[in-house]
Amino acid sequence: MKALLLGAPGAGKGTQAQFITAAFGIPQISTGDMLRAAIKAGTPLGLEAKKIIDEGGLVRDDIIIGMVKERIAQDDCKNGFLFDGFPRTLAQAEAMVEAGVGLDAVVEIDVSDSVIVDRMSGRRVHLASGRTYHVTYNPPKTEGKDDVTGEDLIQRDDDKEETVKKRLAVYHEQTEVLVDFYSKLEGEHAPKYIKVDGTQAVEAVKAEVLGALGK
């Protein structure tokens, strides 16, 4: 199973990725992890990427795609892989097809912006322990205080409404063209396109995703 998981920040991709990788016995591949591993291993592509990152630049698509091809040739990918957060742009998706990297399925976890803003902006965290609450769905016993220690809860900068809205705008700008690209692909490179309502309960989303993937 060679699959790509799409979904806005806060759509619940991470949770579903764990279910998919466990069900098919495949690794989850993210470009961040891949870059770090290549840099640590000192591969030619890793060294080239490190130089660009050290200079504050963005790693070019040809380097990323070279790394992807190296990564998916490894033994743990013999049954497939799950791409998370890659390809991120139309240029990357087109380059992947040109490089002969095919996909069996593209899974989009679809959640409206208003629901994501509500989910993320309502999160509150106890920093010392990592305990997470939600003002609506999982509130602490005392407003603004951790249940165990009574210490203050904070809202992370990433979860502030304006930040969430900015991240969503970037996601839509970059990724909606991918949705369009994959849903229109034809021939041998055309993956099965699966769109799932991510506002359902986690187990319902899991059942729908795995069912559509043939598990």
From Swiss-Prot:
Entry keyword Kinase: yes
Binding site for AMP: 31, 36, 57-59, 85-88, 92, 156, 167
Cellular compartments per GO CC: cytoplasm
Region span, NMP: 30-59
Metabolic or biological pathway, per its Swiss-Prot or TrEMBL entry: Purine metabolism; AMP biosynthesis via salvage pathway; AMP from ADP: step 1/1
Main location: cytoplasm
Localisation per UniProt entry: Cytoplasm
EC category: transferase
Catalytic activity annotation: AMP + ATP = 2 ADP
Assigned EC number: 2.7.4.3
Region (LID), start-end ranges: 122-159
Highest rank taxon of the organism: Bacteria
Keyword Cytoplasm: yes
SUPFAM superfamilies from the UniProt entry: P-loop containing nucleoside triphosphate hydrolases (SSF52540)
Binding sites annotated in the UniProt record for ATP: 10-15, 123, 132-133, 200
Biological process per Gene Ontology, one example term: AMP salvage
Gene Ontology molecular function: any one: adenylate kinase activity
InterPro entries registered for this protein in UniProt: Adenyl_kin_sub, Adenylat/UMP-CMP_kin, Adenylat_kinase_CS, Adenylate_kinase_lid-dom, P-loop_NTPase
Gene3D superfamilies named among the record's database cross-references: P-loop containing nucleotide triphosphate hydrolases
Quaternary structure note: Monomer.
Entry's family note: Belongs to the adenylate kinase family.
Function, in words: Catalyzes the reversible transfer of the terminal phosphate group between ATP and AMP. Plays an important role in cellular energy homeostasis and in adenine nucleotide metabolism.
Entry note about domains: Consists of three domains, a large central CORE domain and two small peripheral domains, NMPbind and LID, which undergo movements during catalysis. The LID domain closes over the site of phosphoryl transfer upon ATP binding. Assembling and dissambling the active center during each catalytic cycle provides an effective means to prevent ATP hydrolysis.
Protein name, as recorded: Adenylate kinase
Lineage: Bacteria, Pseudomonadati, Pseudomonadota, Betaproteobacteria, Neisseriales
Gene assigned in the entry: adk
